[in-house]
């Protein structure tokens, strides 16, 4: 899953 603000982080 992708999450975060401005950038994509693995959740």
From Swiss-Prot:
One of its GO terms (molecular function) is toxin activity. Expressed by the venom duct. Keywords: Disulfide bond, Secreted, Toxin. The lineage of its organism: Eukaryota, Metazoa, Spiralia, Lophotrochozoa, Mollusca. One of its GO terms (cellular component) is extracellular region. It is found in: Secreted. It comes from the Eukaryota. This is Conotoxin ar5b. The keyword rRNA-binding does not apply. It comes from Conus araneosus (Cobweb cone). Disulfide bonds join 2-11, 3-8. Its main location: secreted. Belongs to the conotoxin T superfamily. The keyword Secreted applies. The cysteine framework is X (CC-C-C).
